UniProtKB/Swiss-Prot annotation:
Membrane-traversing stretches: none
Key words of the record: Aminoacyl-tRNA synthetase, ATP-binding, Cytoplasm, Ligase, Nucleotide-binding, Protein biosynthesis
HAMAP family: His_tRNA_synth
GO cellular component labels: cytosol
UniProt GO MF annotations: ATP binding; histidine-tRNA ligase activity; RNA binding
Catalysis: reaction(s): tRNA(His) + L-histidine + ATP = L-histidyl-tRNA(His) + AMP + diphosphate + H(+)
UniProt organism field: Aeropyrum pernix (strain ATCC 700893 / DSM 11879 / JCM 9820 / NBRC 100138 / K1)
SS bond list: none
UniProt record, GO biological process: histidyl-tRNA aminoacylation
Protein's name in the database: Histidine--tRNA ligase
Length: 435
């Protein structure tokens, strides 16, 4: 603090009411989309045993990005959730009686020891939807369709859905370059958006690959376009490879269902986490360029690491933090709404406060959000506070209102003032509210 105002740690944020109102509105839209596909809500602890997360994400995440700590009493190591997928896998393994396929959505905070920058924080909310128990392309198609519908519901213009398949790349690399372990290559390629083409080239060279091999990799990952065209080209060149053939058949069936002009096949897409095994996807905005706003894919081996048997799974994570940042920058979202209150009961005469209190109770029971003076301020001050917060309807209570059993309602936006009996006040307020 050092003499200044107290503030949260670097990479962590406070969300004042106007921000939380926007966040809640957007998250409720996502919940509606998830539930429209029949996904059920789930929550898991913010803290997991370290051994639950260890060995699931890859070296960089586990050595640098996961927040972990030791219990000073038991000596056992714990970690904050790095994502919502590994906890899901642990949950499924812990509950073997779940009906399959198990479709869940989970909206919750995760923590990563990232270097804070635009669109990247150390504490943020993920919005995940996953299908556990189906190995078929239909499940992956539903995930792609859900991702498209989610971004549409959030009102963002100009986005693309990039898809690929880990097996497709593995098979092409196997045929072209003889790789039997492409994971180090994937990790280098995954940095393309962060470090650019030349940066990836240098990363590949650091792996000790010959220059000709590096150039061939760079050429392969430049293949992108309409899925049908790219897949047909790959089938002609590498269709004899078993991994390529499996991936092509799966992708073609998946994309025949999830048919959207915004979907493209991009061979540079690998997704950095080690647990992906098949189709993968990312959603990127045309503007602003802030990285992916959603991503996911198939991870058929992860649940089995806990359950001791193969259980297929696929899913997507929507990055609400980047979406909000992008929407504010584009002007799609605003922070104009400062309060959830729809009505301010303005008490003009303290002698009739009990009547004002009863009026507020009736309005609340009618489903309205109501504020009433709690600081014994003058009527003028109450009006000023309500105006500053942007509360759309004022309900005045003075001697004539209390003695006559009515309220005087006023809407500045509509320029309308009306006196209504207390029993009709709810409907009258609803008519005055902005549509």
């Amino acid at each position: 603090m050092a003499g200044g105002r107290p503030r949260p740690p670097r990479g962590f944020r406070d969300f004042p009411p106007e921000v939380m109102i926007l966040r809640k509105r957007l998250l409720s839209r996502l919940e509606r989309v998830f539930e429209s596909y029949g996904f059920d809500p789930l929550d898991t602890p913010a803290v997991e045993y370290w051994e639950t997360l260890s060995g699931k994400y890859g070296e960089e995440a586990e050595s640098r990005l996961i927040w972990r700590f030791q219990d000073p009493w038991s000596g056992r190591w714990y970690a904050l959730r790095y994502d919502l997928t590994v906890p899901l896998a642990r949950f499924v393994a812990s509950n073997p009686g779940l009906p399959m396929p198990f479709k869940r959505y989970h909206i919750g905070k995760v923590w990563r020891h990232e270097e804070p920058q635009k669109g990247r924080y150390r504490e943020f909310v993920q919005c995940d939807a996953d299908i556990v128990g189906s190995p078929y392309p239909e499940a992956d198609a539903e995930i792609v369709s859900l991702a498209v519908d989610s971004i549409d519901a959030l009102g963002l213009p100009g986005f693309r859905v990039r898809v690929n398949d880990r097996r497709l790349l593995a098979g092409v690399f196997e045929e072209e370059l003889g790789f039997d372990n492409p994971l180090p290559i994937y990790r280098a390629i995954d940095k393309l958006d962060k470090i650019g083409v030349e940066g990836v080239r240098r990363e590949l060279e650091r792996l000790g690959l010959p220059g000709s091999t590096v150039e061939r990799i760079m050429e392969i990952i430049s293949w992108r376009g309409r899925p049908g065209e790219v897949l047909e080209s790959v089938r002609r060149g590498y269709g004899s490879n078993e991994k390529v053939r499996e991936a092509l058949d799966h992708l073609e069936e998946m994309l025949s269902l999830a048919d959207d002009k915004r979907v493209e096949l991009d061979m540079s897409l690998v997704r950095g986490l080690d647990y992906y095994t098949g189709p993968i996807l990312e959603v990127v905005l045309d503007e602003p360029r802030i990285g992916s706003v959603a991503g996911g894919g198939r991870y058929d081996g992860l649940v089995g690491m806990f359950a001791g048997r193969d259980i297929p799974a696929t899913g997507v994570s929507i990055g609400i933090e980047r979406i909000i940042d992008a929407g504010l920058e584009l002007g799609v979202y605003s922070l104009d709404v400062k309060t959830v209150a729809q009505v301010a009961v303005v008490v003009l005469d303290r002698r009739y406060y009990r009547y004002a209190w009863e009026a507020a109770r009736i309005l609340r029971r009618g489903g309205l959000n109501v504020r009433i003076d709690l600081s014994r301020a003058s009527g003028q001050v109450q009006r000023r506070k309500a105006s500053r917060l942007g509360i759309p309807v004022l309900a005045f209570v003075g001697a004539k209102e209390a003695e006559g059993g009515f309220l005087t309602l006023y809407s500045a936006a509509k320029g309308e003032r009306v006196a209504v009996p207390l029993g009709e006040a709810v409907k009258a307020v609803e008519r005055l509210l902005p549509s």
